[in-house]
Curated annotation (Swiss-Prot):
Subunit text: The cytoplasmic dynein complex consists of two catalytic heavy chains (HCs) and a number of non-catalytic subunits presented by intermediate chains (ICs), light intermediate chains (LICs) and light chains (LCs).
Purpose of the protein: Acts as one of several non-catalytic accessory components of the cytoplasmic dynein complex that are thought to be involved in linking dynein to cargos and to adapter proteins that regulate dynein function. Cytoplasmic dynein acts as a motor for the intracellular retrograde motility of vesicles and organelles along microtubules. Required for spermatid differentiation. Is not required for polarized transport in rhabdomere development and appears to be a non-essential component of the cytoplasmic dynein complex.
A single cellular component GO annotation: cytoplasmic dynein complex
UniProt keyword terms in alphabetical order: Cytoplasm, Cytoskeleton, Dynein, Microtubule, Motor protein
Protein name according to UniProt: Dynein light chain Tctex-type
Subcellular location: Cytoplasm, Cytoskeleton
Family assignment from sequence similarity: Belongs to the dynein light chain Tctex-type family.
Disruption phenotype: Male sterility.
Chief location of this protein within or outside the cell: cytoplasm
The keyword Transport belongs to this UniProt entry's keyword annotation: no
Amino acid sequence: MDDSREESQFIVDDVSKTIKEAIETTIGGNAYQHDKVNNWTGQVVENCLTVLTKEQKPYKYIVTAMIMQKNGAGLHTASSCYWNNDTDGSCTVRWENKTMYCIVSVFGLAV
């Protein structure tokens, strides 16, 4: 594969690492606090976007984040995309600590 094409691909492992770092930096070892969730989710998505756009890859990004208290409730989600499997991609990370779950999805759409 050509190096320039490799450099511009959506690499799931790299995106996953970016997401995990954004979550750890923002939430880390904090306990769930309802009044901070809105701020945390905003910071997580902004941190992800900042890192991803600094890479200057030819993508438009969509980032979603959800924080949920661990209280035994269930959660089911789904997403569907119509895109080019050769150039576009997605990555979802589920992170948790003792009191909460954080689920972040990044969709990369080639320009």
